[in-house]
Curated annotation (Swiss-Prot):
Keyword RNA-binding annotated: no
InterPro entries attached to this UniProt entry: Cyt_c-like_dom (IPR009056), Cyt_c-like_dom_sf (IPR036909), Cyt_c_1A/1B (IPR002327)
PANTHER family: CYTOCHROME C
UniProt superkingdom: Eukaryota
A Pfam family the protein falls into: Cytochrom_C
UniProt KW keywords: Electron transport, Heme, Iron, Metal-binding, Mitochondrion, Respiratory chain, Transport
Localization, UniProt: Mitochondrion intermembrane space
Protein name: Cytochrome c type-2
Residues annotated for heme c binding in this entry: 20, 23-24, 85
Keyword Nucleotidyltransferase on entry: no
């Protein structure tokens, strides 16, 4: 199992604003060019209503946990070949942990 360090919410907020916000939201169910991340943890990949996922995402058989998100964020295209995700990923462990900390709090409101 992947060990994830404690993330920093404020750092994660800044990462989200600069790297994710152009395509995703966490505080509503309304999709942008990428799906909403509202309530993502515990949900299956490719299941947010109102978003047209790639077959790779729909057929991934992944439940989003902190661990799966951590691994995915390192290199989305490698983790899920065929995904529409255009983001190259976050190489730094701390950045991924920080972003997950932010998404975890904001997506559960």
């Amino acid at each position: 199992m992947t060990e994830i360090p404690e993330g920093d919410y404020e750092s994660g907020k800044q990462i989200f604003k600069t790297r994710c916000l152009m395509c995703h939201v966490v505080d509503s169910d309304k999709a942008k060019s990428g799906p909403s991340l509202n309530g993502i943890f515990g949900s299956s990949a490719g299941t947010v209503k109102g978003y047209d996922y790639s077959n790779a995402n729909k057929n991934a058989n992944i439940v989003w946990t902190k661990e799966t998100m951590f691994d995915y964020l390192a290199n989305p295209k490698k983790y899920m070949p065929g995904s529409k995700m255009i983001f190259a990923g976050l190489k730094k462990v701390e950045d991924r942990a920080d972003l997950i900390s932010y998404i975890e709090v904001e997506s559960s409101k």
